[in-house]
Amino acid sequence: MVVTDSPVSGIMADQNIDPNTTTSPSPKEKHVSAIKAISGDEKAPSKEKKNYASKKSTTVIQKSHCFQNSWTFWFDNPSSKSNQVIWGSSLRSLYTFGTIEEFWSLYNNIHPPTKWVSGADLYCFKDKIEPKWEDPICANGGKWSMMFPKATLECNWLNTLLALVGEQFDQGDEICGAVLNFRARGDRISLWTKNAANEEAQLSIGKQWKELLGYNETIGFIVHEDAKTLDRDAKRRYTV
C-alpha cells in the first residue's frame, strides 16, 4: 500500500493504519462471497491444509490477494473548495492499494457516509488516473450516476467498489473509477468511463451496474465535455 499524500484530517476514522492488519469486513454474505470469488478461496481447504493448520508453529505466513489493478482513494474537502482558484486544486490523493487486505484495512477506517458533511467528495480511481475532466484518460469520457438516500448509500457504495476492484464489469477496461458525492439535494454515486463515443461499452456498464445494485430507476450517462460547457443543463447521451 502506498501513501500518496498526507491524509486529509477528518476523513479517516483511524489514520494509524497497518496495511498488514485487516479489520474484519461486514458480515453480509454478498460481500464475503465477492471477496472469496476475487481471491479464489471459494473451495474448502484440503485435508492436507487442515493437517498443516493443526500443527503447532511459531511462523505465520500471510498471503496477500492482489487485484488486477491498483486503485487510489482521493478526497475533495468542501472547506477547501471555496478557496480554490483552479477547479480540482483542492483534490488530495489519500492511499493507493493493490490487495484485498489493503482495501479492507482502508475501507474500514474511513468514516461512514452518515458522518460526512455536504459538499465532500470521495473518489476511488485506478492508479495513475486523476479524477478530473482534464486527465487524458478521462477527457473523452463521461459518467453514469445514481441517487441514494442515506440509509442505503454506504451499502451501495461498498458494492460498487467491490464490483470495480473485483473486475466484475465486462467492459471494465473502459472504467476510470467511482465517485461518491455528498450533497444537500441528494447523495450520488457515479461511474466515470473513458470513451463516451463507445455506445456499446457505455450501455453495457450502465446495465451491469444497475443489475449489481438492484437499482430499478432509469439512469443517464452525461458526457464530460457537455457537463463542462452546459453544467446542469447537460443532456443525457444514453439511458438504461
Curated annotation (Swiss-Prot):
Chief place of localization: nucleus
Region of interest called EIF4G-binding, as start-end residue ranges on this chain: 65-68, 75-111, 159-168
Region (Disordered): 1-51
Domain of life per record: Eukaryota
Disulfide bridge positions per record: C138-C176
Keyword field contains Transmembrane helix: no
Keyword Endoplasmic reticulum on entry: no
A GO cellular-component term linked to this record: nucleus
Role noted for this protein: Component of the protein complex eIF4F, which is involved in the recognition of the mRNA cap, ATP-dependent unwinding of 5'-terminal secondary structure and recruitment of mRNA to the ribosome. Recognizes and binds the 7-methylguanosine-containing mRNA cap during an early step in the initiation of protein synthesis and facilitates ribosome binding by inducing the unwinding of the mRNAs secondary structures.
Protein name: Eukaryotic translation initiation factor 4E-3
Gene: EIF4E3
